């Protein structure tokens, strides 16, 4: 947010080189990279990573790059395609963080819950990290899966994500008006897909699909 405030409309690109690729297995490195990208993309930023010839940057000295596994190249293509497709709800400079205004114990306009799991406003190992932003195209809820991780170090090896099921989104809405909710997942179809909404008075409830690494929920109240 600070970088965007001084960027004067320029893209925010972090020199967040993933040195983990040169130190850990492709699987552990890809998981770390996914969590890094989920964090950056959901905040409207990207990183310096993809090099030439299927290599990834692991060091500020670009000669020290790493030949990416085929699975890494496919993953990066999938995630970059996702970023481009959903640019309007991820990268628009008018997007603002509103988590504290919409979620939490004092403001329950947007709530996400899972059985026997913590949902947090800050990244914490073992939890689902929830953020809410306002965009020109409605509210967006970001869910990032840190369940099963031992730490939140962005450039350290990460275990394969534990699939988190049983999530429910609850919205406070105007009686007689049904909100629309869409979900997208870079490790799923990659496209926004509409979810079924069930209204109970001033509340609308939505059963969420299983959470892999990152889900983007677009909410039109």
What are these regions (language model features)?
Residues 24, 50, 151-153, 179-181, ...:
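Short acidic, gly/pro-rich beta-turn/loop elements at beta-sheet edges
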Residues 38, 112-175, 215:
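Carbohydrate-binding surface patches
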Residues 17, 144-146, 172-174, 209, ...:
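Structured loops at beta-to-helix junctions and adjacent beta-edge loops in soluble globular domains
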Residues 180-204:
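Solvent-exposed beta-strand/loop surfaces of large extracellular or lumenal domains
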Residues 200-221:
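C-terminal beta-strand-rich structural cap/linker in extracellular carbohydrate-active enzymes
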Residues 1-114, 120-121, 132-133, 192, ...:
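Glycan-processing catalytic domains of CAZymes
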């Amino acid at each position: 947010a600070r970088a965007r405030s001084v960027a004067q409309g320029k893209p925010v690109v972090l020199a967040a080189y993933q040195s983990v690729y040169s130190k850990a297995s492709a699987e552990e490195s890809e998981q770390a990279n996914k969590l890094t990208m989920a964090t950056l993309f959901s905040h409207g930023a990207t990183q310096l990573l993809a090099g030439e010839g299927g290599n990834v940057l692991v060091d500020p000295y670009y000669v020290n790059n790493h030949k990416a596994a085929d699975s890494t190249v496919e993953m990066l293509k999938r995630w970059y395609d996702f970023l481009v497709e959903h640019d309007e709800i991820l990268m628009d400079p008018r997007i603002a963080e509103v988590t504290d205004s919409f979620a939490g114990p004092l403001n329950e306009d947007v709530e996400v819950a899972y059985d026997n799991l913590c949902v947090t406003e800050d990244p914490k190992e073992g939890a689902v990290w929830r953020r809410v932003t306002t965009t020109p195209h409605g509210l967006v809820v970001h869910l990032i899966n840190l369940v099963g991780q031992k730490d939140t170090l962005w450039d350290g090896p990460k275990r394969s994500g534990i699939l988190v099921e049983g999530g429910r989104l609850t919205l406070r809405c105007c009686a007689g008006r049904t909100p629309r909710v869409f979900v997208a997942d870079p490790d799923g179809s990659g496209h926004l897909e509409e979810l079924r909404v069930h209204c109970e008075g001033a509340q609308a409830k939505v059963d969420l699909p299983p959470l892999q690494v990152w889900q983007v929920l677009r909410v039109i109240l």
